[in-house]
């Protein structure tokens, strides 16, 4: 089994990978340019578990992990930070911390919606936004018509 601690950022990620069968530890930084991330994770054989800290720019990564059928655990940022005695942030150290918490079975996993649930939420949020926009336009047009003394029947 391969266990990966990952410190994910917008342009790159630092990883610490442990192969539990060989005991080999590998540390690496992956740029998010081209297909470097996809190539790296698709090259991993056997069962793989990846641990990342929750952040705003992680949806693409979760989709990639789901596509590659890799188990990805998302951790609570404050609880991950509380597990580290040193308060100094460092990408390499953060990746090693995530790896250590995964190995010790202390990784503070949070609940994440499934892809279907995320899609439904996005659809509902977008629909709500369009309905509000339509209402705003209707109200504006009504105000313009009333300001110009235009009425059509008793309704307006």
What are these regions (language model features)?
Residues 1-156:
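A detector of single, family-specific signature residues
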């Amino acid at each position: 089994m391969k266990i990966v601690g990952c410190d994910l950022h917008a342009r790159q990620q630092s990883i610490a990978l442990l192969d539990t069968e060989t005991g080999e530890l590998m540390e690496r930084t992956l740029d998010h340019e081209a297909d470097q991330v996809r190539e790296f994770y698709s090259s991993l054989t056997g069962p793989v578990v990846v641990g990342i800290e929750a952040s705003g720019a992680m949806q693409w990564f979760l989709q990639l992990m789901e596509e590659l059928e890799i188990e990805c655990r998302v951790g609570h940022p404050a609880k991950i930070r509380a597990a580290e005695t040193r308060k100094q942030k460092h990408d390499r150290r953060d990746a090693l911390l995530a790896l250590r918490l995964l190995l010790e079975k202390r990784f503070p996993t949070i609940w994440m919606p499934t892809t279907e649930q995320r899609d439904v939420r996005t659809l509902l949020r977008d629909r709500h936004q369009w309905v509000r926009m339509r209402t705003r336009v209707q109200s504006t047009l009504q105000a313009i018509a009333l300001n110009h003394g235009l009425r059509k029947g008793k309704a307006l």
